[in-house]
């Protein structure tokens, strides 16, 4: 489930230090700055700027203290700034512009770019942006603007496609487009989850998932 930008960023970190995690630590610091800035902008939608400055570090601290980030350097941690800023764009629109104004093409394109980055880091985290675009599409449909909804989806998909361009060129030049698809999409969707092979039945899958969610919530009460 690990995408190209994840390897690219870790490759840059490796250039800083071949034998330590100094480069990865620097990468995490840079990402944390974007996390903090995004959290602050979200809070500013609801509270005074000074209050947002005080609360933002606390929110980030609680997030990093989560069991999900226990080991550090996970794909989810790399995705976090893109998810936070995507959340900010949607909250800003629905809090300050909807229903009087349609979401601008610039914001839709930005949302697509963020989704494209997540798709090339860990595509299974795209569920957030699927819901994001569905909400925007429904905001157009609520105004009976079907053409606007289609146009908005097109702009979003255009933005989402842009982060793929460097990798399409790279793998095409190396004659490895199919290998890219097979390793990143096919294996993760069909082989990794064992959907096509013999495995546990539906009831056992539900039981296992419920047990996992129980222990995750028990270790981190924030999930409640």
Question: Language-model segments: what does each one mean?
Answer:
Residues 1-22, 29:
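Short hydrophobic/aromatic helix or loop-helix immediately within or flanking a transmembrane segment
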Residues 69-78:
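Short acidic/glycine- and proline-prone juxtamembrane loop motifs at membrane-interface regions
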Residues 80, 160-164, 204-224:
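Alpha-helical transmembrane segments at the extracellular/periplasmic loop-to-helix junctions
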């Amino acid at each position: 489930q690990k995408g190209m930008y994840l390897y690219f960023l870790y490759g840059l970190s490796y250039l800083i230090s071949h034998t330590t995690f100094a480069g990865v630590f620097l990468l995490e610091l840079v990402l944390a700055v974007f996390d903090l800035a995004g959290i602050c902008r979200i809070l500013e939608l609801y509270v005074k700027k000074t209050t947002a400055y005080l609360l933002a570090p606390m929110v980030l601290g609680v997030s990093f203290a989560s069991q999900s980030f226990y080991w550090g350097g996970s794909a989810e941690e790399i995705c976090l700034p893109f998810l936070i800023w995507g959340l900010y764009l949607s909250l800003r629109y629905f809090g300050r512009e909807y229903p009087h104004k349609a979401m601008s093409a610039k914001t839709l394109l930005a949302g697509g770019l963020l989704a494209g980055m997540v798709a090339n880091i860990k595509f299974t985290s795209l569920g957030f942006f699927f819901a994001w675009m569905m909400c925007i599409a429904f905001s157009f449909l609520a105004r009976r603007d079907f053409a606007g909804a289609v146009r908005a989806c097109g702009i979003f998909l255009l933005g989402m496609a842009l982060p793929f361009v460097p990798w399409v060129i790279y793998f095409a030049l190396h004659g490895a487009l199919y290998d890219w698809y097979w390793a990143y999409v096919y294996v993760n969707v069909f082989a990794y989850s064992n959907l096509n092979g013999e495995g546990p039945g539906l009831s056992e899958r539900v039981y296992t998932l419920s047990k996992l969610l129980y222990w995750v919530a028990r270790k981190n009460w924030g999930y409640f």
